């Protein structure tokens, strides 16, 4: 049974143009309050971004739904997430595909996200502490790559790890950021600009 708060959020997302019912069902199935600090629990089902510490945020549900929808996932899709963060986006993906790979540069966030995912019995996720700019070459190629922080330009390593027909969805830019969708077609990459966005920067390197 979906609660009133969850139903209200889903209706708001539909009004904002989210059409993929599988994505909406995944959002309804993942308890967002489990991925944020207790002080913000009362805001868990509001359509806003919230701080999770270490200068990072949990994205607003609309942006999670929009980016996930753009990936055009099937259960068999091989998915890479750059920026595990709280693990919320990871959990949404884990409800939609058989397996998710996720890279986080901040060790403390990676550890907390793994704990939350296990508590929710989401065991179809592999997480790695590392530099998101480099992707996860050992697990490539991927059908879908999602980046939850903004690099100033599209990382070439991530484009190289896309399989034929694969889709990369990410925010790009410094002061002015735009959500981009990159699709690999043979030796070419077709890049579409979706909408203006605001994300924390994708920082190179990793933190213990």
From Swiss-Prot:
Entry keywords, A to Z: Cytoplasm, Methyltransferase, S-adenosyl-L-methionine, Transferase
A cellular-component GO term for this protein: cytoplasm
Enzyme nomenclature, EC number: 2.1.1.77
Enzyme class: transferase
InterPro entries found in the cross-reference section: PCMT, SAM-dependent_MTases_sf
Localization in the cell: Cytoplasm
An example molecular function term from Gene Ontology annotations: protein-L-isoaspartate (D-aspartate) O-methyltransferase activity
GO biological process, alphabetically ordered: methylation; protein modification process; protein repair
Entry-linked SUPFAM superfamilies: S-adenosyl-L-methionine-dependent methyltransferases
Cleavable signal peptide: none
Pfam families per the UniProt record, alphabetical: PCMT
Disulphide bond pairs: none
Residues the record marks as active site: 59
Catalytic activity: [protein]-L-isoaspartate + S-adenosyl-L-methionine = [protein]-L-isoaspartate alpha-methyl ester + S-adenosyl-L-homocysteine
PROSITE patterns the UniProt entry points to: PCMT (PS01279)
Gene3D superfamilies recorded: Vaccinia Virus protein VP39
Similarity comment: Belongs to the methyltransferase superfamily. L-isoaspartyl/D-aspartyl protein methyltransferase family.
Role played: Catalyzes the methyl esterification of L-isoaspartyl residues in peptides and proteins that result from spontaneous decomposition of normal L-aspartyl and L-asparaginyl residues. It plays a role in the repair and/or degradation of damaged proteins.
Protein name per its UniProtKB record: Protein-L-isoaspartate O-methyltransferase
Native organism: Salmonella typhimurium (strain LT2 / SGSC1412 / ATCC 700720)
């Amino acid at each position: 049974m979906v609660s009133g708060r969850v139903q209200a959020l889903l209706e708001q997302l539909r009004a904002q143009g989210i059409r993929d019912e599988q994505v909406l069902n995944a959002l309804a199935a993942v308890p967002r309050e489990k991925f944020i600090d207790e002080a913000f629990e009362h805001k868990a089902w509001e359509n806003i971004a919230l701080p999770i510490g270490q200068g990072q945020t949990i994205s607003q549900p609309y942006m999670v739904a929009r980016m996930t929808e753009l990936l055009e996932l099937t259960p068999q899709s091989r998915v890479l997430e750059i920026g595990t963060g709280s693990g919320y986006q990871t959990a949404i993906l884990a409800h939609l595909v058989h397996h998710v790979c996720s890279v986080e540069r901040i060790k403390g966030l990676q550890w907390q996200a793994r704990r939350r995912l296990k508590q929710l019995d989401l065991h179809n996720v592999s997480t790695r502490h590392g530099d998101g700019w480099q992707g996860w070459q050992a697990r490539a190629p991927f059908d879908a790559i999602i980046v939850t922080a903004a690099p100033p330009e599209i990382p070439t390593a991530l484009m190289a790890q896309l399989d034929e027909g694969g889709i990369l969805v990410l925010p790009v830019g410094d002061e002015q950021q735009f959500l981009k969708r990159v699709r690999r077609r043979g030796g070419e990459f077709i890049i579409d600009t979706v909408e203006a966005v605001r994300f924390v920067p994708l920082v190179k390197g990793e933190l213990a």
